[in-house]
């Protein structure tokens, strides 16, 4: 089961995602990211975008995934409210393939909150918890 939350971090907002699988944790932290930007509960699945990124390790993979989503928000004007991803390790690197579901940003509908300027490695953690679930977190640049 995917879950996400924001957490206090000095003057910034931390985002954290949980899942029964690594993929669910990545999906959940992406939801947390977009809930910093808008009210994700108001986003409809009107567009489906294919996502494919890779990284040398899980941290760089998470960075690349969220950076791609933020790019699509900034350049294409899209907001996302759901994700389905698969992660595999191949030839010494991690590959994430999946889909992001959302729609064009509408300030009247989506209730804008904060502007996320960039994804960072600040306070980034990806770990398996004692209960077997996965957690992914970081502090984006607001």
From Swiss-Prot:
InterPro entries assigned to the protein according to its UniProt record, in alphabetical order? Archease, Archease_arc, Archease_dom, Archease_dom_sf
Query: In terms of domain of life, where is this protein from?
Result: Archaea
List residues binding Ca(2+).
Answer: 12, 141-142
Q: Any idea which GO molecular function terms this record carries?
A: calcium ion binding
Q: Which UniProt keywords apply?
A: Calcium, Metal-binding, tRNA processing
Coiled-coil stretches are none
Q: Give one Pfam hit by family name.
A: Archease
GO annotation, biological process: tRNA splicing, via endonucleolytic cleavage and ligation
Q: Which family does it belong to?
A: Belongs to the archease family.
Q: What does this protein do?
A: Activates the tRNA-splicing ligase complex by facilitating the enzymatic turnover of catalytic subunit RtcB. Acts by promoting the guanylylation of RtcB, a key intermediate step in tRNA ligation. Can also alter the NTP specificity of RtcB such that ATP, dGTP or ITP is used efficiently.
Q: What is this protein called?
A: Protein archease
- Species: Pyrococcus furiosus (strain ATCC 43587 / DSM 3638 / JCM 8422 / Vc1)
């Amino acid at each position: 089961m995917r879950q996400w939350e924001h957490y206090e971090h000095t003057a910034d907002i931390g985002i954290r995602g949980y899942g029964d699988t690594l993929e669910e944790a990545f999906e959940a932290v992406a939801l947390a990211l977009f809930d910093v930007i808008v009210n994700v509960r108001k986003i409809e699945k009107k567009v489906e975008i294919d996502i494919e990124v890779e990284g040398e390790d899980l941290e760089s993979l998470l960075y690349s995934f969220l950076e791609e989503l933020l790019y699509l928000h900034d350049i294409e004007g899209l907001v996302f409210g759901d994700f389905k991803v698969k992660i595999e390790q191949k030839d010494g690197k991690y590959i994430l393939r999946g889909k992001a579901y959302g729609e064009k940003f509408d300030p009247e509908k989506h209730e804008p909150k904060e502007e996320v300027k960039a994804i960072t490695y600040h306070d980034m953690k990806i770990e398996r918890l004692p209960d077997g679930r996965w957690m992914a977190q970081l502090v984006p640049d607001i």
